[in-house]
């Protein structure tokens, strides 16, 4: 350091003067040496004080920076805890919501399965009843067709018999009808002539 170099130079110079000087000069040299050493000590003390001041300022800055970092860390940790707590709350809420929804869906699926089974049973029963009704209806229709065919045959036979009987009766009474019609016709023409009418003009 510069003060040390300066001190050493002065000490060497003082030693040289000490060898070649008188007692008064030696005393003066000692006095100067003491002053130089005092000055050197003051310089060292000032330097140490400056270094201490700088170290204290650096320490204060570091402490301030450390406090800022600690505050930022605490704030970050607090925010992190708040975020974690909020995420945990949302996760729990979502879990509960999903659990509730899952139970609802399971209940709906169970209910739909029961309804489906009921509908299938009812459809099967209705199909069986419809098939039985169709078979019964087919049997009834077959019986009706047979009965109608039998009745048609009987009615046709009765009709033919009645027509034959009627024709036979007509053949028996036709000669009498013809004579009566002829007499009636002759009488009507005579009556027309009596009224002065010609039957051929009518």
Swiss-Prot record:
It is found in: Cytoplasm, Cytoskeleton, Flagellum axoneme. GO terms for cellular component: cytoplasm; cytoskeleton; motile cilium. Residues 1-30 are annotated as: Disordered. InterPro entries: DRC12-like (IPR033585). Residues 1-20 have a biased composition (Basic residues). Residues 26-146 form a coiled coil. Keywords: Cell projection, Cilium, Coiled coil, Cytoplasm, Cytoskeleton, Flagellum. Its main location: cytoplasm. Component of the nexin-dynein regulatory complex (N-DRC), a key regulator of ciliary/flagellar motility which maintains the alignment and integrity of the distal axoneme and regulates microtubule sliding in motile axonemes. Component of the nexin-dynein regulatory complex (N-DRC). Belongs to the DRC12 family. This is Dynein regulatory complex protein 12. It comes from Mus musculus. The lineage of its organism: Eukaryota, Metazoa, Chordata, Craniata, Vertebrata. The gene is Drc12.
């Amino acid at each position: 350091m510069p003060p040390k170099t300066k001190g050493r130079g002065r000490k060497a110079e003082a030693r040289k003067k000490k060898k070649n000087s008188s007692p008064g000069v030696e005393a003066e040299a000692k006095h100067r040496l003491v002053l130089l050493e005092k000055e050197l000590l003051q310089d060292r003390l000032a330097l140490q004080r400056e270094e201490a001041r700088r170290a204290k300022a650096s320490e204060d800055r570091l402490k301030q920076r450390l406090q800022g970092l600690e505050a930022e860390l605490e704030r970050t940790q607090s925010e992190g805890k708040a975020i974690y707590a909020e995420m945990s709350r949302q996760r729990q809420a979502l879990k509960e919501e999903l659990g509730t929804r899952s139970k609802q869906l399971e209940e709906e699926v169970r209910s739909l399965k029961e309804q489906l089974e009921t509908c299938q049973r009812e459809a099967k029963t209705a199909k069986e009843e419809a098939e039985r009704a169709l078979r019964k209806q087919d049997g009834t229709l077959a019986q009706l067709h047979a009965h109608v065919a039998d009745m048609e045959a009987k009615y046709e036979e009765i009709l033919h018999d009645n027509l034959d009987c009627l024709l036979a009766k007509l053949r028996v009474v036709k000669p009498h009808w013809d004579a009566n019609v002829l007499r009636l016709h002759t009488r009507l023409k005579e009556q027309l002539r009596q009224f002065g009418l010609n039957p051929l003009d009518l």
